[in-house]
């Protein structure tokens, strides 16, 4: 679970894309890769942005779909073709003036392990490889690409005390 203490420190949400925001499948057949994103994940990322969090993507693969989805959601950054995620994470810390404990990171595979070991709130999706268990404090019930990000953002925003205020506009 994500404690209120840890959640209260979070200033940035950093997500892997393939296997976290998507189910990990990649479609070929044309000039561009085809990816499918869950609408609820996107809506809850918008709520995280509305709560004042820095939200961005850190992906080992480059894709126009990643950039378009990030732009649509108003995310702060997209880093692609990243082969050393820890090195890129350290750059993000410097660029945004963040400390590792102020970050939530979601991953699904061993390439994410070094970053998961550094952040304050390390999260794995339900169908992540078991090797991530040594580093994460929460494993979602939902698999990647099927609401895992929604689930995590809901827990984070609730633990931070932001959720009721963000949902007020829907309760009128």
Set out the residue ranges of the language-model regions.
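Short, catalytically relevant binding-site loops at active-site mouths
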Residues: 28, 61-65, 85
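Alpha-helix initiation and capping sites
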Residues: 38-42, 60, 83
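Short, active-site-adjacent cap segments at secondary-structure transitions
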Residues: 21-22, 64-66, 112
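Mg2+-dependent phosphoryl-transfer enzymes with acidic/Ser/Thr/Gly-rich catalytic loops
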Residues: 4, 28-38, 72-73, 77-79, ...
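Substrate-recognition element of Asp-dependent hydrolases with the DxDx(T/V) motif
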Residues: 45-69, 80, 116
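Active-site neighborhood of HAD-like aspartate-dependent phosphohydrolases
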Residues: 1-54
């Amino acid at each position: 679970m994500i404690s209120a203490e840890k959640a209260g420190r979070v200033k940035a949400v950093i997500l892997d894309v393939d296997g976290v925001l998507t189910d990990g499948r990649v479609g070929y057949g044309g000039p561009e890769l085809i990816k499918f994103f869950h609408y609820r994940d996107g809506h809850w990322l918008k709520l995280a942005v509305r709560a004042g969090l820095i939200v961005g993507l850190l992906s080992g693969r480059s894709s126009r779909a990643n950039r378009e989805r990030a732009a649509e959601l108003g995310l702060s950054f997209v880093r692609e073709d990243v082969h050393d995620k820890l090195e890129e994470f350290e750059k993000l810390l410097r660029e945004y003036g963040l400390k590792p404990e102020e970050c939530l990171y979601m991953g699904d595979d061993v390439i994410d392990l070094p970053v998961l070991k550094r952040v304050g709130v390390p999260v794995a999706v339900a169908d992540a490889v078991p090797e991530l268990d040594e580093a994460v404090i929460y494993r979602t019930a939902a698999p990647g690409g099927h609401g895992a990000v929604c689930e995590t953002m809901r827990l984070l925003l609730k633990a931070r005390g932001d959720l009721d205020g963000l949902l007020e506009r829907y309760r009128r």
